[in-house]
Amino acid sequence: KKLLESPYADPNRAHNPQKEIYRHSAGGNYNVAAFDAGQAYQLALRWKISGDTQCADKAVQILNDWARTCTDGVNQTQYQTDSHRLLAAGFIGYQFANPAEIMRDYEGWKKEDFEFFKEWITKTFYPICYEFLGDHFNSEPEDGWMSWDLPAMLTILSIGVLCDDADKINFALRYFYEGEGMGCIENSVVAMHEDPAGRVQGKHLAQSQEMGRDQGHATLNVPLHAYFCQTAYNIGIDLFSYKDNIVLDLCEYTAKYNVNPNETVDLPYTPYYSGKEGWHNVVASDGRGRQRPGWELIYNHYVKIKGVNAPYSQEFAETMRPEGGGERGTAEACDLGFGTLMYTR
């Protein structure tokens, strides 16, 4: 029902492919790409569930039209910094890759069009993400954020899976394990804490690198980690279990602080130095309570599949259920959403 109520799941909604994708401090047109990718994803889900070929044909049309129209890719404009270029490529790339992966078996998507789409998504989004993770645009890796590295990693992994490209898959996975930047799981965690409330046993609350920045970005890392781990899981690689479920530990810490934003929370916190902003001495309250998709995936994987306790993630999933596509419940520039539909066990 949530999916059917979304205006982006309507095959009659007009899409709007652009010649280039750009993002800057005043906005840009990247949202146009994100919402069209979200529409393709939601229509692909409708086709996969119901077999509705009208939805399938529209999803394919969106993907084909973007591949044919967006010839200038993610361009550097006079208003756009390198970080804006990276964020446009990182967040849009994986969102186009996901509906394409669903639709790859649809007989109505011509083989030559599918091959052209794979070429387009690779040349448009991959080079920027690879360059950024390689040298962070000639800056120090610690000067960046988790929410910069993670979408770049996710887009490379998603393109690798879509294109059956083992080199891209392995690059993204290696970065998760041992990369220099904040997307590496070793660098994502500032400190491990015990839960003063006793709901999480042992030192299994992981304070993430952006908890002292603001909660809008800290909560964004939950779906990014969730989608990255799920994409790997779909090809037989279990990152969810890595280092005794450390991704869950990150999510539990974030959920504990954000799930009930008006309540006082006894939250242990370790001050840390950010290369981008200096010392973060207290947990940031800005944006506290931000609701994003991703909690259903985390909850269902850890609790329903693995049988692991995840009280705060479970509470967040229950709060947002049924999960739509972003805070607006339809589509959002950073998140695919619809986890209740996709991951409920």
Question: Where do the language-model regions lie?
Answer:
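Flexible internal linker/loop segments at domain or repeat junctions
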Residues: G183-E210, E277, N281
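Solenoid-like repeat scaffolds
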Residues: E178-M182
